[in-house]
């Protein structure tokens, strides 16, 4: 599903800025000038200009005339995107149940085992690892659907929710619940039970939406 290719400097800058905006490093309403970003990132203004243009096309930035203004993702945006995910991801899971491979199931199993390891690991905060493994599970689900359209659409929605997802899984009780929901989805996929996979995924996303709705923006 994913291709390995050389990433240009403009692509690297785009991905870095997108990640920084979606994780909250740059706040909504903050102005990002080419000069400032050139100094911060240590690159010329040409790839920055290209990256900013692409971020404006993604509606993550807007042009104010004095620089690019961070639009980011609001709580309302997040809830709207979850309404889309609730329906689409259930359908993707239903499709995945019919065509998921043993290798993809094994990758899911390994991801869930690691997720459990970090949730149960005592000591310092492991929210970043748990969030990344949560993303990995969902990416595998999208890939397993066998549909490029589902994969690209759902991957984009999932990525744009980064800040809210991290805040949600930082709550240990929600991280535990989410893992149990992932396990139920995995078991349905293992049985190639499309309707069960759809229903478990639907419930998982409704619970995740309700949890995120309680997160302070």
Describe each model-derived feature in a short phrase.
Residues 1-4, 195-217:
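C-terminal effector-binding regulatory domain of bacterial HTH transcription factors
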Residues 173-175:
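Active-site loop of classical SDR/Rossmann-like NAD(P)-dependent oxidoreductases
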Residues 102-167, 180-188, 196-207:
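Conserved amphipathic alpha-helical segments that form helical-bundle/coiled-coil interaction surfaces
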Residues 65, 88, 110, 177-180:
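Alpha-helix N-cap/N′ positions at the starts of helices
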Residues 20, 24, 63, 115-118, ...:
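A short secondary-structure junction motif
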Residues 1-98, 214-217:
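Short linear motifs at protein or domain termini
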């Amino acid at each position: 599903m994913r291709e390995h290719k050389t990433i240009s400097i403009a692509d690297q800058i785009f991905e870095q800025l997108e990640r920084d905006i979606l994780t909250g490093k740059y706040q909504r309403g903050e102005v990002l000038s080419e000069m400032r970003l050139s100094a911060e990132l240590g690159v010329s203004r040409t790839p920055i200009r290209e990256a900013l243009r692409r971020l404006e096309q993604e509606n993550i930035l807007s042009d104010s005339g004095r620089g690019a203004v961070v639009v980011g993702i609001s709580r309302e945006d997040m809830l709207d995107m979850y309404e889309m995910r609730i329906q689409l991801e259930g359908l993707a899971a239903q499709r995945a149940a019919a065509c998921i491979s043993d290798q993809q199931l094994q990758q899911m199993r390994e991801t869930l085992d690691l997720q459990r390891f970090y949730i149960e690991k005592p000591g310092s905060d492991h929210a970043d690892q748990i969030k990344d493994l949560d993303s990995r599970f969902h990416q595998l689900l999208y890939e397993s659907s066998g549909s490029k359209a589902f994969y690209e659409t759902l991957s984009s929605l999932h990525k744009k929710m980064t800040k809210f997802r991290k805040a949600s899984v930082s709550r240990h009780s929600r991280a535990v619940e989410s893992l149990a929901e992932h396990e139920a989805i995995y078991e349905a996929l293992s049985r190639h039970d499309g309707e069960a996979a759809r229903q478990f995924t639907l419930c998982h996303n409704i619970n995740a939406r309700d949890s995120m709705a309680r997160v302070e923006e």
